[in-house]
A protein has these predicted regions:
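Transmembrane-helix signature of 12-pass secondary carriers
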Residues: 1-22, 26-30, 34-36, 40, ...
Length: 512
């Protein structure tokens, strides 16, 4: 197809056009120029229609007009890029299995909250050790996102895409054999390290393979997968909490999704945008031909560029990094605290301890999951910025109600939690979508990693401090602190949130 297009372009180019006969009689009797015939033949070959040679000045002008129209169409086709294609089953597969790392994150985080109901009395954990077990995974995520993002930009998306899932499965099995709190903390830290590495890997792959019209939906799948993993963990925990040594089955069960992910990820190729950014043009072209077809071109301005973290500290990009880090912190700190210590928080609101408190957490998990579904589409219809600001407002309202009325009836508690959880859908997607849209290919994974790592500083502190704060101040003040964080994110977003709807990755990553 590209060779046929080249022939058409050469045929209609002015320098090669044959001169028109000087006299009217010659023009009337002479056949159409060889060039025009060649152009029409090439056009016919591509379009599947036949064109007969024309004669005469009027026919010549008509032919030239037709060729000009075809040339314009051909030029448009030549410039067709990833953003112009439709979603295919293979692109959906990339989204599905790339989202699996997010599923694992939600699963391993939420399952520990349920497992702690058995681990705490078994290992005689005090508040400090319980907090350490909960926070250790976030410390691992903090280092994993930074290191994983840098390595992903340096050595590629695909290599890290496989390694991290294997490691998560191995350390999940090892955590089953923990004989004391320290071993459990170390195993959880290692799991967090590789879960954190998967954030920049998977979301970069999705962003670089997905057309812009579908990007918010594909990133929405990442966010939905997190909530789906957390919801699945809550129900698995609910089923196993009454079994002797159920905590071992809970922690070891993470190996099942790891195996499924390995099977699904084995044939997903390297990102063509990353390959081109490293000067590997032939490999990039081969991936494009395999995934999109020979007629689709890579973005023209993706030029070979050396990966450098210093690039992110340029004035404009540094501002974006700080904003995204704080925004994500304000969004995820309350959510992670709720998931990690969900049963304790539910008990504090009056849901009886044990299985009923776990069931209450499961209901809240469903609200989180349901909220991502309309948000996927609202991000395109309403835009990124309006949805973010509106969602943060309603999230704050839900937490303020919980903080002011901690002794409210259970139905009020569930509705307030539901309000907070449902509207977390938009910001939950944007924590993945914004970093991938606002930074260029050669530092995209690094930017995702750094912005996520900034937020994880807050999650480490909050996860360690939540049980201590709950014990000393109660659930009402705890919820008000969470509301304050969401309000901070709201104020910053009013001041700084960009609008990237409908833009290509090249357009959205440019500094204004």
């Amino acid at each position: 197809m590209r060779r046929a297009i080249k022939k058409i372009t050469q045929a209609v180019s002015p320098p090669q056009a044959a001169p028109v006969a000087a006299s009217a009689g010659a023009a009337a009797s002479a056949p159409t120029s060889t060039t025009s015939v060649a152009a029409c033949s090439a056009v016919a070959a591509v379009s599947g229609t036949a064109s007969a040679p024309a004669s005469g000045g009027a026919s010549e002008r008509a032919t030239n007009a037709t060729v000009d129209e075809v040339a314009t169409k051909v030029k448009k086709d030549v410039n067709k890029t990833i953003d112009d294609v439709k979603m295919t089953p293979f692109l959906r597969k990339i989204t599905f299995f790339s989202s699996g790392g997010s599923f694992l994150d939600g699963y391993v985080l939420a399952i520990i909250g349920v497992a702690l109901t058995q681990i705490t009395p078994l290992f005689a954990l005090d508040t400090m050790w319980s907090a350490a077990v909960g926070a250790s995974v976030f410390l691992g995520i903090f280092f994993g996102t930074i290191l994983g993002g840098w390595l992903t930009d340096l050595v590629g998306r695909r290599a890290m895409f496989i390694i991290d899932v294997v490691a998560i499965g191995v350390f999940s099995v090892l955590s089953v054999f923990a004989a004391d709190p320290l071993q459990l903390v170390l195993a959880r830290f290692a799991i967090g390290l590789f879960v954190g590495a998967d954030y920049p890997i998977a979301t970069s792959l999705i962003a670089e393979f997905t057309p812009k019209a579908h990007r918010s939906i594909s990133m929405g799948a990442v966010s939905a997968a997190w909530y789906l993993g957390a919801t699945a963990a809550a129900f698995v925990g609910f089923a196993l909490v009454g079994i002797e040594d159920g905590w071992k089955w809970m922690l070891g069960s993470a190996v099942v999704p790891c195996i499924i992910l390995l099977i699904g990820r084995h044939d997903i190729p390297e990102s063509p945008l990353w390959l081109q950014s490293k000067g590997k043009f032939a490999e990039a072209r081969a991936v494009m031909d395999r995934v999109f077809g020979e007629d689709i071109e890579i973005h023209e301005d993706e030029q070979p560029t050396k990966t450098s973290l210093g690039f992110l500290f340029k004035a404009g990009y540094f501002k974006r990094i700080i904003y995204l880090g704080i925004l994500t912190l304000c969004q995820v700190v309350p959510m992670y605290a709720i998931y990690t210590f969900g049963p304790d928080i539910m008990s504090a609101f009056g849901l009886s301890e044990g299985r009923m408190s776990i069931l209450g957490e499961s209901a809240v998990s469903l609200f989180f999951l349901i909220g991502t579904i309309p948000a996927m589409f609202w991000l395109n219809s309403l835009g990124r910025r309006p949805l973010l600001i509106g969602s943060l407002f309603f999230m704050a309202v839900g937490l303020v109600i919980l903080g002011i009325f901690p002794d409210a009836p259970i139905w009020v508690v569930i509705i307030a939690f539901g309000l907070y959880a449902f509207f977390s859908g938009g910001p939950g997607i944007l924590q993945w979508l914004y970093p991938n849209e606002l930074f260029p290919t050669h530092v995209r994974a690094s930017a995702v990693g750094i912005s996520i790592s900034i937020s994880r500083i807050g999650t480490i502190i909050s996860t360690y401090g939540t049980p201590i704060f709950l014990e000393n101040f109660g659930v009402g003040p705890t919820m008000l602190v969470a509301a304050g964080l969401v309000i901070l994110g709201l104020v910053l977003s009013v001041m700084m949130a960009p609008e990237t709807r409908g833009q290509s990755l090249q357009e959205s990553s440019m500094l204004n």
